[in-house]
Structure formats: structure tokens, C-alpha cells
């Protein structure tokens, strides 16, 4: 499909341009030439402070945005296809809420001295481990119920209920927590691509790429599922096996991104629809790579918008993502009604 290939190439160019812009823009604007020299290792005529800003702050943020955006977007695409629900997203199963509960247990019960942006190594690992365990605990429940409930709609409802239970527990923890603990948790809940330092980038990237590769293995089964479960079974697709693999990959990607970046909103829900509108196809052979690229582009764009105030501060990520995501979802709902 020439159109799909062309759009993927365009999205790649846009992603590279936004990646460079992420390295240039911030509280201090750094010339593109100096950024290139820093990345190439030619730092002889570059300010040491600029080198530190690019290598220790902006580069990991940009890489995190690419990986997180691609991961959440693919999760949304797989869930929307598998459940034939245009409003399905990574948070629909309560995975984000499970991760949030894990972080709340660390931040609120252990004195509230931790924050995602600035912690000791042990504290940072504790936050990440708690988020990951919480998210995967929810996934274990979803796996269990998927063996009992065959209806896609009922499984979605169960996921929503699990999310409500987790959010209720978080509210109780906030009620009994200290002011410092509540503030610390709120900062994490705002979402940020700045929570992954270069020290942890290898771990984050390895797990995320592993999940993305796993999602690519589902392209053919997802195309079959578009025609209905019965048709897919006639083609030899093991529906239960595909569903379990899909839930595992979705859980892994959502857990790792939420643990490192907080509960990032709307990217998983809106980006698959943006990709569909661009390609005007449901063929996952082209749609899935385009969704990954589109997710990375949207995440990089949001990160640039977050730093636009410059020296005045950084806008919370979850204050920006709805600006892009909400209009897309409203358009999809109106189109579905027609």
C-alpha cells in the first residue's frame, strides 16, 4: 500500500524534526549546531552546562517520549480492535489505576518522602517496582476473569470496576496521608517524560521494545479479528490464545510506561484514531507501524508544548495531552453517531 508507506515516511520525518526540537527548546534554548556537536561528542567549543542539559535531561526525555508514545498508542490500537470498541484504551482495564495504587502505597504509606522527579536510587526503584507490581497484579486479575468471561464487553466492564476499586483505595490512602505525601503523589499523577534518566534508559527501552515487537506479532490475528471471532476461528486463529497474548503485551507496555512516566492520558485512546484518519484503512500491516510513529510524534509534540513557558516552569504532561486527544475522541463519537 503506497499511501501507507508514504505516510509512515512522512511521520518518520516529522518525528525526527520534533526530536531535534525537543533537544533545542526548554528553559534555555540551545542552538541546533551545538546540539549536534554534543550528540557527536564534539564538545570542545560547547558550554559544559549545555552538554549536561542535553545529555542528562532533554535527550532522555525525548527518547522516553518516543517509546512511551509508541507503546501507549499501540496498546490502544490493539484493545480497540480486539474488543471492537472505538473508545477502548490502555486504562480501560484499570492497569493505570493498579500502577497508581502501587505508587500510592510507597509514597503515602512510607512517609511521602518520595517523588518521581528527584529521589534516591533506592526510592526511585521502590516507586518503579511498586507501579509495575500494581499494574501486573491488575493484569493477573484480568487474565483470571478472561478464562471465565467470554464476552468482550463484560471483560471491559470488569476492568473498569477493578479500576474503580483501585482508585477508591488510592483515595483512602490520600485521606490518611501527610501533606507531603499527597503532594508527592499528585506530582507523579500529573505525568512526565522526565522520570527516566540515562541510567534507567536501557531497562526502560529494552522492556518497551520487547513489548512493541510482541505487538507486531499480532498484526495478522488482529486483521482476522476485524471480521469477527467466528470468521477468525475459521481461519485457524486461536481466539483465546490471541486474547491472552494481547492482554499480556498490553499489560506489559502499560505497566512499564505508567511506572516510569505516570498515568499519561489520552495518547492510547486518541492516537489510533489519528492513524486511521490518515491512512483510511484498518489493515494492521500498515496501521500498526503508523500508530507507533504517530504516538511518538504526538508524545514529542506534547513534550515540546510542556516546556514552552521556558524559565517560568514546565506544564504538567496531563494538562497538555487532553488538548490534543479530547477533540479527536469527540470527533470519533460524533462520526459514530452518524
Segment roles from a protein language model:
Residues 1-338:
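Alpha-helical transmembrane segments in inner-membrane proteins
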